[in-house]
Amino acid sequence: MPKPKGTCGATKMKILAVIHSNEQSGDVSYGYNIWQSLKDNFYTYMNDNDIRNVYHHLNDLCSLGYIRKCPEASDDIKQCYRITSSGSGIQEKYNHFLEVLEKNA
């Protein structure tokens, strides 16, 4: 049974951890490289068709105010994402995913 729309499950927490980790290392978070990181580190969304699910999660996280689109990007180029202060405020919920990313780095 799917979670109600607007809730934060494990996949959204993993995405927040990936974006947070990228920001800490000075990398930019795009939908594609977030998906690659989910595949490589968490063995999630292994099918190439699953990338669309990542974009649904990114849109939900934007709506919830945990991430934002980079202001310098426009709709006709790659969209990057950054953590907001609200997203940083729930870091304790995705810390264990950050540890996995650090261990695999």
Regions found by a protein language model. Give the residues of each.
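Amphipathic alpha-helical dimerization/coiled-coil segments
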Residues: G89-A105
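A short, conserved structural fragment
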Residues: C62-E72
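Short, cationic-aromatic polyanion-contact patches
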Residues: E72-K93
